[in-house]
């Protein structure tokens, strides 16, 4: 049985607010604005096709990239799709519908974080909400990068404080009274290995 967390309509405006520092601009220029701040993160994760494409174009290889071959709900160009299939990556595919975070996505993210090899997670559906579990599951001092449509790239440094912010958001999504399966997802997202 598949379990999922759905983002209620009333919380969707929260997702339009950047979860970190927004670097305004387009393409390579935007990446160059924050490239010097990357340092040596414990893990570098990119969420989104266009962000991943521009990182790879400037020679920055994320440890984990999460893509769906779409941008703003339309197919990406063949150039973007081809570049994002860089041979350095092992690929895993998951189903994850729009507006939802599935248990399959969360389990795949856990496996990707445990891997020493670069992983490309191809999402059949939509990857937009993946940023939330990525921040919770990432090690401290990781960096998460994702696109903010028509504005630029959001740079999130994973800290205890940032994890706390995202945990608070998840508590709104998963009430304490929900079923055992959702409780298992909550424990995984809180960093517990027992599932």
UniProtKB/Swiss-Prot annotation:
Record GO biological process: coenzyme A biosynthetic process
Superkingdom as given in the UniProt entry: Archaea
- Specify whether Aminoacyl-tRNA synthetase is a keyword of the entry: no
UniProt binding sites for GTP: 49-50, 68, 127, 150
Q: Name one GO molecular function term.
A: kinase activity
Q: Which reaction does it catalyse?
A: 3'-dephospho-CoA + GTP = GDP + CoA + H(+)
What's the Enzyme Commission number for this chain?
Answer: 2.7.1.237
The protein's UniProt keywords, in alphabetical order, are:
Coenzyme A biosynthesis, GTP-binding, Kinase, Nucleotide-binding, Transferase
Q: Does the keyword Metal-binding apply?
A: no
Q: What class of enzyme is it?
A: transferase
Q: In which pathway does it act?
A: Cofactor biosynthesis; coenzyme A biosynthesis
The protein's job, in short, is: Catalyzes the GTP-dependent phosphorylation of the 3'-hydroxyl group of dephosphocoenzyme A to form coenzyme A (CoA).
Family according to the record: Belongs to the GTP-dependent DPCK family.
Q: What is this protein called?
A: GTP-dependent dephospho-CoA kinase
